[in-house]
Amino acid sequence: SMSFRKDGNYLELTADSLDELFSKENTKLCIFIHGLACTEWWWSSYAEKEYGDPRLNYGQLLEKDLGYTSIYLRYNSGLHISKNGASFTKLLDELVKASPREIEEITIIGHSMGGLVARSACYYGEQEDHSWVKKLKRVFCLGAPHFGAPLEKVGNFLTNALHSINTPG
């Protein structure tokens, strides 16, 4: 099931847990979203390759350099993007409501399918008038196939072609 993660652990959306997450000085939140068939660990493996430290991830670098609180979204990439987007917008709304501190700004960074899930969540969040949308300052989509992935296009073409063939049933 979809959840937020921090340092590899499930993040409970309770006032106590979120009070530990945010420092008194820092209420800027960055959410990293992985791509297809990955988990939040994807962000660590690339930081390790680039910076040579196996304990390092991009969230930690963002916290150190720009003062953000970073968390990671884990979701089932086998589900449809719209279903994940709708679930993400509700989960983010729960986080904002449960936080004992006012979250002043939100940034979302999505890789590949994660960028599409982020975009879908923004759509549903706006449609449903969630309060977190007003706090959203940036969405970065890294390698997100906004116009369709080549494999998905081929799959759709083949599906339509096969449906047009009259087969005895």
Describe each region flagged by the PLM:
Residues 1-73, 83, 90, 101, ...:
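Flexible, membrane-associating and regulatory peripheral segments of lipid-active enzymes
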Residues 34-37, 73, 80-169:
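Serine-dependent carboxylesterase/thioesterase catalytic core
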